[in-house]
């Protein structure tokens, strides 16, 4: 049976973690990005489908390529973040299922239903984006996830001619706490949950 993590870990991962809009100039190494993926890839997905594909943008050139897709409110925070991750989903994720889910012919579940394939890829890549955020926090990094961008532009600029489609962006780095907004409320258990 698993043991609960420490209260300090819960604070780091959830209750004290914040969405950051400003960044310190401390770089994030490529090795750290590899560590992030090594953690997040173990999060569960439907039939182990693992549809997320991530582009970690670390260079000025990469950020300039992304710039036209950003909403005005997300521009400065993204250009100054050490890393911006494009979390995309592979519309043909099912081609990897013989490796990832060898227990049966899971590939045919999705080749026979394009709608199911798209819903599965989008939903599960969203879950994987959340795992990436938690992995960042576990390694001492801060994040700023965003959906305010031109997805079609990103798809054309970064994924043209491929089977990838963008889902969301996540800025990653070491946050500047002086630029945090006041903590916003969350819904109570009674407002968000039910018991049957």
Curated annotation (Swiss-Prot):
Cross-referenced SUPFAM superfamilies: FMN-dependent nitroreductase-like (SSF55469)
GO biological process, one term: uracil catabolic process
Database matches in InterPro entries: Nitroreductase, Nitroreductase-like, Nitroreductase_HadB/RutE, RutE-like
UniProt superkingdom: Bacteria
Keyword terms: Flavoprotein, FMN, NAD, NADP, Oxidoreductase
Keyword Amino-acid biosynthesis: no
Annotated EC: 1.1.1.298
Essential cofactor(s): FMN
GO MF terms, alphabetically ordered: 3-hydroxypropionate dehydrogenase (NADP+) activity
Reactions the enzyme catalyzes: 3-hydroxypropanoate + NADP(+) = 3-oxopropanoate + NADPH + H(+)
Induction: Up-regulated by the nitrogen regulatory protein C (NtrC also called GlnG) and repressed by RutR.
Record HAMAP family: Oxidoreductase_RutE_HadB
Record PANTHER family: MALONIC SEMIALDEHYDE REDUCTASE RUTE-RELATED
Function: May reduce toxic product malonic semialdehyde to 3-hydroxypropionic acid, which is excreted.
Family per record: Belongs to the nitroreductase family. HadB/RutE subfamily.
Protein name: Probable malonic semialdehyde reductase RutE
Gene name of this polypeptide: rutE
